[in-house]
C-alpha cells in the first residue's frame, strides 16, 4: 500500500473516532496519517485544533511545522497548495505567540 493510501486510511479512522467522541484514538490516527506525509490538510487541521483546545502548543507547533514541510514539498499544479501553506504559516505564528504567553 502506498503511503498516501495508508495516510488516507488512517485519516478516515481518525475521523470516525472523533465523530464517536474518542479524542485520544482520533489523535493517535491523525498522527499516524501525518506520519505518512499525507498531503490532505484535514489531519493537520484537526490535530492543531485538538491540541489548541488542550493548550498543548508544543504539539500544535510541531504539527504545523510538519504541515508546512509537507505542503512546501508538493510538486503539483494543485491550486490549493499556496492558500493552505499560508494558512498553516499564520496558525504557526499564532501558536508561537500563545506559547510565549504561557
Locations of regions flagged by a protein language model:
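Structural register within alpha-helical repeat arrays
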Residues: 6, 13, 46-47, 67, ...
Amino acid at each position: 500500500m502506498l503511503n498516501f493510501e495508508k495516510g488516507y486510511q488512517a485519516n478516515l479512522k481518525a475521523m470516525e473516532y472523533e465523530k464517536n467522541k474518542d479524542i485520544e484514538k482520533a489523535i493517535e490516527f491523525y498522527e499516524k496519517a501525518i506520519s505518512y506525509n499525507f498531503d490532505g490538510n484535514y489531519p493537520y487541521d484537526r490535530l492543531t485544533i485538538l491540541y489548541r483546545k488542550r493548550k498543548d502548543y508544543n504539539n500544535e507547533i510541531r504539527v504545523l511545522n510538519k504541515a508546512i514541510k509537507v505542503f512546501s514539498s508538493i510538486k503539483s499544479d494543485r491550486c490549493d497548495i499556496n492558500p493552505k501553506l499560508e494558512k498553516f504559516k499564520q496558525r504557526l505564528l499564532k501558536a508561537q505567540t500563545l506559547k510565549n504567553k504561557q
